[in-house]
Design a protein with these regions (language model features):
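Ubiquitin-like/PB1-type beta-grasp interaction modules and other compact soluble beta-rich domains
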Residues: 1-75, 79-100, 120-124
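A short, surface-exposed helix-loop junction/capping segment
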Residues: 4, 255-263, 419-423
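Residue-level marker of alpha-helix boundaries and capping positions
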Residues: 13, 269-270, 396
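Short secondary-structure junctions
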Residues: 28-31, 84-89, 284-289, 411-415
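Auxiliary tRNA-acceptor-end handling modules of aminoacyl-tRNA synthetases
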Residues: 51-69, 90-94, 102-371, 375, ...
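Hydrophobic alpha-helical membrane-association signature
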Residues: 74, 118, 275, 397-401
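Short, conserved phosphate-binding/catalytic loop or strand-edge motifs used
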Residues: 95-105, 418-423
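Extended, charged alpha-beta segments that form solvent-exposed binding/catalytic grooves
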Residues: 362-423
Length: 423
């Protein structure tokens, strides 16, 4: 068996080896720091046994994927601590996220004093140093297990899985959770953590479901890294746009108007007008032509474009398909509208590329628990562009789009740490 490491070097073994055994074979220091392995691109437990040729990367908390495993384990320690102190709490889900981790519980809200007590209990659990073990059950046995423990949310998750599925569990001491993993080998690996806040969240993000209590936390490999992160969070609070925007009289919100529907104050209108003129001028320089399309359309348009099937739950729908002859919806995006601008005329291939630009007001029915300031709202204005191009023009036009985005971000001073997502 030949194992190819991240640096291209190779290790040859006569028999199967676990990821942690290979880590020790590389160096004891690496093994002590290891959080997980990445085998042929898949993140796995350190206890995973490798029995065939593969590419292997040993992940530590310095790696984004390794840190995610550490934080996922921290969420399990959190859940164990909560159920130790609050035995009636029902567990839902507890993933790692970009900034840390969270876990959702069906129980009354937690106070800051509660969070402090939970932190202390987590430290006790970590000090005991229980090993983390993975095991599996059949779908039927897994459902019976959580029914006996009166954990309805776990039962629901398992029931959504196909019949015949093998269900994985992770246990630490006498506490067990449903989980696909991976996790650290011991709770001792959670060395530096902090519970940050508690809030409400709907089960599975739907307002039709039960309201749960969510605890947010973060975790790092060292106390110094945690301290640095917490200091950055405090600085971010001081610079929070939601706070500064109100202080500078740029925008405000009013309960009677509704969540995610900000009032733009005169100072904010001036800023928006300046930004709009600037970006439209930049687009014009680059050959964009302006369009102005309706704020709503019949459901037929969204069915043709495919948005109805995929985004209907996130749209503001006017009317009832069962009783009304026509059903309308406020637009969540502009693309199908600008496509019909193109279709309104005949075009030659010589007319291409056609670059349509529009400053669009869009509407999206966001969950109330997801909204904050201007970062997640139900009505917003963006600069949108859609291009009709020939195949031989695609590469250049794509590069020009990225160049425009980079230029705008650079002018606004936010060009660093930008990630581009293609959909």
């Amino acid at each position: 068996m030949i194992v190819t490491l991240k640096d291209g070097s190779k290790k040859e073994y006569a028999e199967a080896k676990s990821v942690i055994d290979i880590a020790y074979d590389i160096s004891e220091g690496l093994a002590r720091a290891a959080c997980a392995g990445e085998v042929n691109g898949e993140v796995v437990d350190l206890r995973t046994v490798i029995d065939s040729d593969c590419e292997l990367n040993i992940l530590t908390a310095k790696d984004e994927k390794g840190l995610a495993v550490l934080r996922h384990t921290a969420s399990h320690v959190l859940a164990q601590a909560v159920q130790t102190l609050f035995p009636d709490a029902k567990v839902a889900i507890g993933p790692s996220i970009d900034t840390g981790f969270y876990y959702d519980f069906d129980c009354p809200p937690f106070s800051r004093d509660d969070l402090d007590a939970i932190e202390k209990e987590m430290k006790k659990i970590i000090k005991k140093g229980a090993k983390i073990e993975r095991f599996t059950k059949s779908r039927e046995d897994a459902i019976a297990y959580f029914q006996e423990k009166n954990e309805p949310y776990k039962v629901e998750l398992i029931e959504d899985l196909p019949e015949g599925s093998e269900i994985s569990f992770y246990s630490q001491g006498d506490w067990t959770d449903l989980c696909a993993g991976p996790h650290l080998m011991s709770v001792k690996g959670v060395k530096a953590f902090k519970l940050l806040s508690s809030s409400s969240a709907y089960w599975r993000g739907s307002e039709k479901n039960a309201m749960l209590t969510r605890i947010y936390g973060t975790a790092y490999a060292s106390k110094d890294e945690l301290k640095e992160h917490l200091e950055q969070m405090e600085e971010a609070k001081r610079r929070d746009h939601n706070k500064l925007g109100r202080e500078m009289k740029i925008f405000t919100t009013v309960d009677v108007i509704g969540q995610g529907l900000p009032l733009i104050m005169p100072n904010g209108v001036i800023m928006m007008q300046e930004l709009q003129r600037w970006i439209e001028d930049e687009e014009t320089k680059r050959g964009y032509i302006r369009t102005k399309t309706p704020l709503m359309a019949k459901s037929d348009l969204y069915k043709i474009s495919g948005h109805w099937d995929h985004y209907k739950e996130g749209m503001f729908v006017l009317g009832d398909e069962e009783t009304d002859k026509e059903v309308f919806a406020l637009r969540p995006m502009t693309c199908p509208f600008q496509y019909y601008v193109y279709k309104a005329e005949q075009h030659s291939y010589r007319d291409l590329p056609l670059r349509y630009g529009e400053t669009s007001t869009l509407f999206r029915n966001e969950d109330s628990g997801e909204m904050h300031g201007l970062t997640r709202v139900r009505q917003f204005t963006i600069s949108e562009g859609h291009l009709i191009v020939r195949p031989d023009q695609m590469v250049k036009e794509f590069k020009d789009c990225i160049a425009l985005a980079q230029y705008c971000l650079q002018v606004l001073g936010v060009e660093e740490d930008v990630t581009y997502h293609l959909s």
